[in-house]
A protein has these predicted regions:
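Structured binding/interaction patches within domain cores
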Residues: 2-245
Length: 245
């Protein structure tokens, strides 16, 4: 979902809002100082490892998982297990044995040649999940190609991936100073339920709770109330409420 540039928006912000390529968005995030987005091996790394931008790395993991979940129905079980493991790894550590097991299983689920993505569209989902494991760069062109089920749907899939990115990372040109007073028990409860269930149908109610707590930030409230806005685990507003951003 492309948004019209805000009045007085900088050239960078306008480009962010207009971008239709996930690679372009991630490139802009990297240029703004997110070291995790330049990292070549972010996915199966221990959550307590020392890296300069742990929160950006977590969001990158959740973004790649959200892209994979778009083709969940065609993913083989080992690939699904890998995605679920990476989601868990975003918020907690996994035992080394468990991590090694799901990574190995995901490797075995990888189709052996890229032509399968083009020749057999339903293999695209398998390659999507495997790409971040095998190539360890979830945002490479190969992964983008993989997530597109057919050539005719490429533009729509690119747009969907951009929507996911904007939902997770927010607008880097308009950082929100989140007041801890907005983090009421009602707001936290709503956000926690949505985060765990992946059902974000109560985002408008979260907006009401935040507003009742004194939040007047237009970007926050509009993000919650926009009926066309996609929301996934890692949503920047939900993360702010839960103290994950």
């Amino acid at each position: 979902m492309n948004k019209k540039p805000a009045r007085g928006a900088s050239a960078g912000e306008s480009a962010w809002n207009r971008a239709r390529s996930l690679g372009t968005l991630l490139g802009r995030l990297a240029s703004l100082g997110h070291p995790a987005l330049e990292d070549r091996n972010p996915m199966f790394r221990p959550a307590d490892a020392e890296f300069p931008d742990r929160r950006a790395e977590r969001k990158l993991r959740l973004l790649m998982c959200a892209c994979c979940r778009r083709v969940w129905d065609v993913l083989p079980e080992p690939a699904r297990a890998a995605v679920e493991a990476v989601e868990k790894l975003a918020d907690e550590n996994l035992p080394d044995k468990e991590l090694d097991a799901v990574e190995s299983a995901a490797y075995r689920a990888v189709p052996q040649s890229v032509w399968m993505v083009e020749s057999h569209p339903h293999q695209a989902g398998r390659w999507t999940a495997a790409a971040f494991v095998q190539d360890v760069i979830g945002y490479t062109p190969r992964c983008l190609r993989a997530a597109r089920v057919t050539k005719e749907e490429q533009a729509a899939e690119e747009q969907a991936q951009c929507d996911l990115c904007r939902d997770i990372f927010g607008n880097p040109y308009r950082p929100v100073a989140f007041d801890a007073a907005w983090r009421t028990s009602t707001a936290v409860s709503l956000a926690s339920q949505m985060y765990e269930s992946r059902d974000f149908g109560t985002m408008p109610i979260l907006a009401d709770a935040l507003q009742d707590a004194g939040c007047g930030d237009k970007d926050v409230l509009d993000h919650c109330r926009d009926e066309k806005q996609v929301h996934v685990r890692g949503c920047w507003v939900v993360d702010l409420v839960l103290g994950k951003s």
